[in-house]
Amino acid sequence: MRIIAIIPARGGSKRLQKKNIFPIWGRPMISWAISAAHQSELIDETWVTTEDPEIAAIAKEWGARIHNRDPKLAEDHIYKMEAIRSCYQHIEHHYSADVVISLQANSPQITAPVLDSAIQCFLKNNRNELISVDKNLMQNAAFRIMRPWYVYQRDLSTKTGVYVCDVVDVHTREDVKFIEESYNDRNS
């Protein structure tokens, strides 16, 4: 079984400039998602899709493969899944995957054990899609696990599941401050 993670990371963040590479716990924010995917026992390959050369260089430094995103797919009004689709279409030219994960660059609290547990839940329950939610069951966008054909799906499946993963979706300096004050380091 081949499982790939795709981390969408555009350079045009508005509320927190350079959000995806903003330092948190002494590292670029995106590095936490890349490390979690690399440390996963189930994820085979990690891709970052970006139009930003600085993000690409940092992601490559942390071991991710890079998909050079069309700048049109990095505009404010573009839905994240458009970038995921474009990246997966590129990957499909070389090989197919059994599971595709959209992994958020700005959820630095995500860990390999959480990802592995969510993937196992997805597979065990034979879902088409599994989305991360917070403790109030509200989507937090930390990850979205999908069957490869679901990357192209436009409608919600009746075989969608949720996985409780209480992480902060970082968009502001206040979010960064909250995480750093609430969790002295990533391992607390």
Task: Give the predicted meaning of each segment.
Residues M1-Q17:
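N-terminal nucleotide-binding beta1-loop-alpha1 segment
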Residues R2-I3, I43, A97, R127:
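Local beta-strand N-terminus motif with an aromatic residue
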Residues R2-I7, I30, T46-V48:
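Hydrophobic targeting segments
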Residues M29-E45:
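A short, N-terminal amphipathic alpha-helix
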Residues S35, W47, P53-I101, I110, ...:
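Short phosphate-binding loop-to-helix
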Residues T49-T50, V170:
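Short beta-strand scaffold positions
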Residues H77, E82-S86, Y95-V99, Q104-K177, ...:
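Conserved core of the sugar-phosphate nucleotidyltransferase
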